[in-house]
From Swiss-Prot:
S-adenosyl-L-methionine is among the record's keywords: yes
One GO term of the biological process aspect: menaquinone biosynthetic process
E.C. number: 2.1.1.163
One Pfam family hit: Ubie_methyltran
NCBIfam families named in the record: MenG_MenH_UbiE (TIGR01934), PRK00216.1-2 (NF001241)
Top-level lineage group: Bacteria
Catalyzed reaction equations: a 2-demethylmenaquinol + S-adenosyl-L-methionine = a menaquinol + S-adenosyl-L-homocysteine + H(+)
InterPro entries assigned to the protein according to its UniProt record, in alphabetical order: SAM-dependent_MTases_sf, UbiE/COQ5_MeTrFase, UbiE/COQ5_MeTrFase_CS
Protein source organism: Corynebacterium kroppenstedtii (strain DSM 44385 / JCM 11950 / CIP 105744 / CCUG 35717)
Protein name: Demethylmenaquinone methyltransferase
GO-annotated molecular function: demethylmenaquinone methyltransferase activity
Amino acid sequence: MARATLEKKPREVARMFDAVGKKYDLTNTVLTGGIDTLWRKATRKRLDPKPGEKVVDLAAGTGVSTAELSKSGALVVGCDFSLGMLKAGRHRNVPLVAGDGLNLPFADNTFDAATISFGLRNFGDTAAGLREIARVVKPGGRLTVCEFSTPVIPVFSTIYTEYLMRALPTVAKIVSSDPESYVYLAESIRAWPDQETLARIIQSAGWKEVGWRNLTGGIVALHSATKPR
């Protein structure tokens, strides 16, 4: 199938994820060497959901991140606009709903906290997506964004870039049901802003107390923020 482009047209992105849903989790584990499990645990720790809190997990895909967050005892709802991904996650005992990140199917001030892992990069309008997340989070509520970022060690950065553009698509051909989608993945990661720039975007979207923590040498960064009271 035709892969999505960096124009990030919603229908193209949704079709792309629909196509990779069945093998998405397996492919990610292979491509990351299993580190994706540690990233999910770090995201849960950073967000720090409490028992009884309502949390929305955006770009939840197959619900693997939703299941991890649910270990906290919070009521976690996964939301994604790819029906194929949601279908692939039906076996998980977590609530999953269909919804567009730019027009979420939730009322204002519904959630105590929100998280989005490896999904903000796919929004056509990053700032608009962050404002929409703020709409559904209660005043004083928390946000954690887990996303690919910029390695902080120059030599490591060079090796990582080579992996993205050469090795990643090659490995994807072996394990993925739609390897072309991983060409988009590599391109979108390279085009994504670095840690400091993303922090400014989050702040400009109305969030406060914005900060970040690097994981795996900056391959991934966890940005956190709070909605003003």
